[in-house]
From Swiss-Prot:
Coiled-coil annotated residue ranges, if any: none
Expression across tissues: Expressed by the liver and secreted in plasma.
Lineage, uppermost ranks: Eukaryota, Metazoa, Chordata, Craniata, Vertebrata
InterPro entries reported for this sequence: Serpin_CS, Serpin_dom, Serpin_fam, Serpin_sf, Serpin_sf_1, Serpin_sf_2
Subcellular location, principal: secreted
Membership in a protein family: Belongs to the serpin family.
Domain of life: Eukaryota
Leader sequence residues: 1-16
Pfam family, one: Serpin
Function of the protein: Major thyroid hormone transport protein in serum.
Record-given protein name: Thyroxine-binding globulin
SUPFAM superfamilies with a match to the protein in the record: Serpins
Keywords recorded for this protein, A-Z: Glycoprotein, Secreted, Signal
A GO molecular-function descriptor: serine-type endopeptidase inhibitor activity
Protein's organism: Ovis aries (Sheep)
Amino acid sequence: MPLFFSLVLLILGLHCAPPNSCEGKITSCLSPQQNATLYKMSSINADFAFNLYRKVTVETPDQNIFFSPVSISAGLAMLSLGACSSTQTQILESLGFNLTDTPMAEIQQGFQHLICSLNFPKKELELQMGNALFIGKQLKPLEKFLDDVKNLYETEVFSTDFSNVSAAQQEINSHVERQTKGKIVGLIQDLKPNTITVLVNYLCFKAQWANPFDPSKTEEGSSFLVDKTTTVQVPMMHQVDQYYHLVDTELNCTVLQMDYSKNALALFVLPKEGQMEGVEGAMSSKILKKWNRLLQKGWVNLFVPKFSISATYDLGGILLKMGIQDAFADNADFSGLTKDNGLKVSNVAHKAMFYIGEKGTEAIPEVRFLNQPETTLLHPIIQFDRSFLLLILEKNTRSILFLGKVVDPTEV
């Protein structure tokens, strides 16, 4: 049962700015039914994910990367509800939306359906996206904003005394720990005294492989090439089974799809040696659609490392480079959130945790492993023994739940 956790933290600091107004009628979440807007959003969100990924690689070259694009998108879209004028426009355009083609109400309705679809109960798949908004007691949020974040983003809103920094920090950390079932502890360690609003977005995902690995076939101490001069030893899971896979000769990479038991899949992308940057630069929603069209099922002699990684990012600088500038400036316009005093974003933190194994963190009762063919010489060998990309997708919405690069699987 691979287990994933993601958390987006948006911290807004108090500052003075003249109030303004913004309008837009928002509907409430009625059902998880998908629509044309949702499918349109999947491509837009995917391109945002890869654009963000490329910015992260510049900031953290040659390191493990792991984050939840859909969590970040939802957190920023939710923030845009309280933004107005160019502050709102920059947030939405950085996400890939053109307000001329897609009105604000349609964008928010799309996220409404996305969150409803992701949170809709599914057998054998635990998937929950959640939000929490901690607002300073001295702040008077607009009723419309509170209604919208509750109806659209299923957000809990808490009135918090930020004048007591340690107590506010404990309140937020305790909430996050409860919601992630103890997987994220002590998230905030240095809450700033001028903080007045904290927005938390998290995504919890737990699923069982459709075809679990046999632990007895895991090879301890297998070599994994980190770079030309560095090799580490990792447990390497092994299985001979039928998988959807392909060799993309244009991008010089091998793609393998591993299905979960219900409504989710993992894409493992293995570039040829020296071709990682080329693959990273080409990733897009169009590439995903091409792979989805060309993947074919066949026998594979598969080797995948067993590992866990976690990553924490301050996305403020990256989002600035992606076009979100006013939100961090003194002229930020969040008059859609409150008429008291304006706000500006002081920090955007994101944390994601990842574990993958034969059965995961919990035992799977009565797992039966199918007999594998003795002769494997004719089956192609796909061995993830060097840096590779990893995508976790939800099938119904085609949303990228998680996106990452494994450079060193021994780094936790």
